[in-house]
Amino acid sequence: MRSTYLFTSESVSEGHPDKVSDQISDAIVDLFIGKDPEARVACETLTTTERVILAGEIRGQGIMDTDGNWAPGIEDEIEAAVRQTVKEIGYEQDGFHWETLTFENHLHGQSAHIAQGVDASGNKDEGAGDQGIMFGFACDETPDLMPAPIDYSHKILHRLATDRKNGNAPFLEPDSKSQVTLRYENGKPVACTAVVVSTQHGAGYDEGEKEAELRAYVKRVVADILPDGFLSDATKWHINPTGTFVIGGPDGDAGLTGRKIIVDTYGGAAPHGGGAFSGKDPTKVDRSAAYITRYLAKNVVAAGLATRCTIQIAYAIGVSQPLSLYVDTHGTGTVDDAAIEEAILDIEKLGGLTPRAIRTHLGLNKPIYRVSAAYGHFGRTAEGDRFPWERTDLVEDLKAALA
């Protein structure tokens, strides 16, 4: 790695059309898992002008019977969950309003051929829901053990949303994007060279005093989020660089579930296996294995075993045991990477890295997913049942295994 370089990451807000779709999909996951912790869910959402469409495959007790008939009242609950999600995001606009939008539900039963490969039976453990590779990452650039550019990009937009909802920035609307460029020296972020923030706004905030008010507000937020000394007179600012941004959200661009996988993870600072998270129950290793590898990488860094850690894991559909586990500390490790791999596999309280073991250890069979669907799945605060993959409760086990 070069000693001096620039690196950029972006985030998008909860009101971005793709994130609206992600949150709706995860609201459906939460609804179904709340009824049946073993529910199988693959829910895709399309959002566009005054319309939300669901499609995908589901299975679960109290949700749909084996003949594909919905349980009484469940279709109304699905629609209510969709509208409530859009309402909480804040869309009450002519082109997209939680109360007046048209809703279509095309969810149907899960394929029996997929189910037979995934379900546990007899002496066979539950298999992975699909083949694939998943990555986890952690580094010591921020207190959250996340790459700094994506961490700051998320926090900027989260602050905008908080201020919009509590009335401190009533001129803001839900759709926004951020992008932060940092200069690194000797592998550490030391300065911000550029900030891009595009935020949907009320009428009139694209010129004159109102535009100046919006720009000044955004600069205050960014200055509050970034570490002292990162901003300077040399920092380039691009705030609503295209001008007017009144039409936004699904009315401005169609949204789809699973199109912001780099925003959801590490902002391009680490590899990605390609699988999206939202709309998937935790038997899908695209989701659960990405969570466990983040958890493991974060605990490696938190234990002081490395300052950077990438972990890859791979699965085959219908097979419970992972095909491979790979640890790379990028030359920052205090012990051999292979020893860390061995320690992970030997830690008894993990219970292994099968899909069932991951879900059990992290407590993933709970309705905890909608909150993860905006502002990043990683670098969040583990609180109660939420974001269990952000816990650092494996630190002492790793230290003991490698002593």
From Swiss-Prot:
Top enzyme class: transferase
Keywords, ordered alphabetically: ATP-binding, Cytoplasm, Magnesium, Metal-binding, Nucleotide-binding, One-carbon metabolism, Potassium, Transferase
Binding residues for K(+): E44
The keyword Nucleotide-binding belongs to this UniProt entry's keyword annotation: yes
Residue positions binding Mg(2+): D18
Pathway the protein contributes to: Amino-acid biosynthesis; S-adenosyl-L-methionine biosynthesis; S-adenosyl-L-methionine from L-methionine: step 1/1
Catalytic activity entry: L-methionine + ATP + H2O = S-adenosyl-L-methionine + phosphate + diphosphate
Domain of life of the source: Bacteria
MF-aspect GO terms: ATP binding; magnesium ion binding; methionine adenosyltransferase activity
One Gene Ontology term, aspect cellular component: cytoplasm
Keyword NADP found: no
Protein name as annotated: S-adenosylmethionine synthase
UniProt organism field: Erythrobacter litoralis (strain HTCC2594)
Gene (name only): metK
